[in-house]
Amino acid sequence: MLPPGASELATKIISELEVFVFNRDIRDFFSAFYQEDFLVKWPLLDVVSDNALETYLSTTWHCDGPMKGLLKCFLYLNPVSEHGCNTLIIDEVRTRKLQSVNALPLELERRHTDISAFLQTLGLPETPIEFDLCAGDLLIFAPHKLAHRCLPPRAGKMRYTVCFSVFPESAFKCQIS
């Protein structure tokens, strides 16, 4: 959470970093991935503090709601090695199996910080995918297809990221017949 009055600074940071993130190579990547133009929506300067288990909704395993073509892009502003607040991801095959046994509920109060028992019961590997991200690294994934959670930072540490939601342009076109 940002301190009160920080929204102007956050807006300035986001607008300056958006130009850096969506350089020609990244724009070409998204255009090729979607096979059409894309839109960047709802940029957010995200500050995760060491009390994240009590204050931050994404510390439990979940999939985002099914928004057609959504990719999340997290630009890490400080390295995971500094704060330990990594984004853990489960591959699509294991995610589908976890969904089939209701291990990834949409309701916040029913979500889990530990899904190892579900994975064991399903006979699946328990180790999530994680990256040793450095400042300036970009994590891109499909949050409606891949289970994920944010680990809370170590005591006294904070994670700073800018999150961008990227969609194919067609996701926002109304079709009138």
Feature map (PLM): residue ranges:
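Non-heme Fe(II)/2-oxoglutarate
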Residues: N102-A103, L138-I140, K145-S177
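A short secondary-structure junction signal
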Residues: E54-T59, L71-K72, H83-D91, L98-N102, ...
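Active-site region of the double-stranded beta-helix
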Residues: E36-V40, H62-P66, L77-N86, E92-R94
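Double-stranded beta-helix
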Residues: H83-L146
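Non-heme Fe(II)-dependent double-stranded beta-helix
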Residues: M1-T59
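Short, conserved beta-strand element in jelly-roll/cupin
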Residues: P66-E82, L133, I140, F164-P168
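Histidine-centered catalytic micro-motifs
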Residues: S58-G65, K145-C150
